[in-house]
Amino acid sequence: MAAHDKDDPLLPAPHTHAPASPGRRAFMAFAGVSAGATLLATGRAAVAAESMFPFSSAPGGQPPAQPGHPFASDPIWGPGGEATGIIRRLAHIKPEMFSHADFHVTSYGARTLPASALISSTAWPSGKIPWVTGGTEQTAHPTNDLQSPGSNVMVPCDYTGTQYDSCAAFNAAIMDANRAGGGRVVVPAGNWYCGGPIVLLSHVNFHLESGCTIYFSPNPADYAKNGPYRTANGNLYHTRWQANDCLNFGSPIYAFHQTNIAVTADDNTCVLNGQAMTPIQPSTQAPTSCWWTFKGSSNEYGCAGSSTPSQAYLNPNNVALTSLPASQILNPQANVSFTNQYGTTTTLMDLLTGTGWNEDQNYLPALSELRVPVEDRVFGNGHYLRPCMIEFIGCTNVLLQHYHTQNTPFWQHHPTDCTNVVIDGVFADSVGPNNDGFDPDACNYVLVQNVQFNTGDDCIAMKSGKYLDTGYGPMQNIVVQDCTMQSGHGGLTIGSELSAGVQNVYARNLTMQNENWASNPLNIALRFKTNMNRGGFIKNVWINGVTLPNGVNLAGKYGGGALGAAISKITGTGTTGLATNPSTGQGGLIAFDCDYSPSGDAVRWTPSVISNINITNVNASNVSGAVSYSMPSGFVAGSNSCFQALVMQGSEAVDYNGPLPVPTVSPISGVTISNCNLGSPVCTGAAPTTPSTSASAAPGPIFVSNVSGIALSNVVIAGTTYNTTLTASAT
């Protein structure tokens, strides 16, 4: 068990995380299935698209309240609407909430870097960097072509602990500001180096002045030196990795159980560079790996397969699950035998100790599923779970404003169990593996506005814990408005880790520009994803106004598929053609996937519930021209907006591998899509009369499986207007 340093001045006593029981989670998942029926009948889709956003530039995005305005009676965006209430609640989250006292980091010994410290990625002193200077990595991930200028400048870890390492000065200024009752810690223009986490404390605004760039150490060991948990793997921090709690490397910017905290900047010339593409090794050594190597993708960022340590390959430092002390395994079902629907007698432990249990990316979820206490889920040195760039846990009144993130190790922003969060005017610009832009996790009351996204994964992804780590409750009450998306997997995504549920989501005026459409396109515009491991629910979602001038990815891809079952599906409505490869992974404009990569999870015991989803005014244009990525066999990109327009894959009972009886697997229901023009998909085949796996049976523009009563109203696809209801059984 890790020892917590109670005298550490940077952090309070540890938070005791008590994951919700499966019974509690099931109750939360099913308690509100029918909620929102009244709102569904309000006829909001009739609001004209051109009048949707007349007030988007108003302070806080608040609408005018004049009588007779088209939004005056709108239950979502009107003066008394649900989304408007969230915006007004968060109006006080701004720089003015902090004391006017300034604490200049130069007064604490911070020094700007000499010009010689900044090295071009093509001029590493001890030799070429394989993933930057050429080869398959550069072809597959042309990072320097996709990110903004400056992303290919590196500062080696040689500067950690030198006179140019400003980490101690930054944290000393933060501590002084906190002790003084609050204030603004100011980092002036210039290039700075930080050899470890910046730990924010209550009532402190960490502020970057115009022209400021902070280069964070690329060496993982520098994030396991000063945390409050003393372990054999370093001095670690309470973190959350892919929605499972653990002790791990600290994030470059971190806070735990603080109130009134902020990271702000004068403008987007202020850069927080996580240096995830910079070699871990000092400049005197040949470069062999970086933070992004830890992803474990062969032939990318220096990963040569299983011989390269990463999250995706066997880690000998992981103790066998069957050898864990009995006192750590708190799940009473761990070794209870049961017979599953396939007639196999097994146990939870048997499922968890199958192939791949000793990979870090599987070991942490296994510890969670065994209910091992968080203080015994120890990673850090000797392990390969990358930290988020900015991670705040259990904080209240959080402001993120106007800076620019680059080269982040993992997710760019990860507020967890936070209340009252505003992210405004940030440029989330990092295209490495798992570089999601903004991932609020089990937060309550969140406003995302005026944010630009250029990411290596989902631009926005809403989370609420994975499997048993649901003690923080659902992700709820979030407004997303006036944002721009470029590259990424999903523009606006809910999931996949949503075991405690996601509810009350309001989004409007999103421009999914997708300017890199020919080389690194946005894969999906609106993405809802979960599976029988995540379970959870998605309900009460209102999306109004999404523009896609360059469509999305024109190549279809599925993200796994139902285990042991064909994924081909037709419906009796004639609106969908055969899809042997429905585009839930990429290529679908609007994609629901309740069967997301099931083979990646050893335990699949909880179906998901989706209800009351309202999508209107989504408009996608076609693009014409060559693409640099591969199209599926037999398909050629012409003048198209996507591969398939609408893909809805419900949960599949065949995936369930828990004790009998098999639980009820509800279809996706309560979804209304209206007043949309989804352009011309690559797939426009007519529905075949019988299921077929023939290559000549082209998929249609719509794919549905295990859905009920999906209402399409004035939805135009390839010139055809759909006013119909879609219902289809499971595969």
Where are the predicted features?
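Short glycine/acidic-rich loop motifs that flank beta-strands on beta-rich extracellular proteins
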Residues: 194-197, 217-219, 275-279, 408-415, ...
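Extracellular "leader-to-stem" segments immediately downstream of a signal peptide or signal-anchor
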Residues: 2-16, 23-197, 201-205, 209-393, ...
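Residue-level signal for WD-repeat beta-propeller blades
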Residues: 21, 179, 200, 208, ...
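Gly/Ser/Thr/Ala-enriched C-terminal appendages of enzymes
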Residues: 533-722
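Outer-membrane beta-barrel domain signature
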Residues: 160, 377-379, 436-437, 469-470, ...
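Active-site beta-loop-alpha junctions enriched in small/polar residues
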Residues: 465, 495-497, 531, 595
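Short, T/G/N/S-enriched strand-turn elements that build extracellular solenoid repeat scaffolds
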Residues: 174-176, 193-201, 411-417, 450, ...
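Right-handed parallel beta-helix
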Residues: 210-211, 259-270, 396-406, 419-430, ...
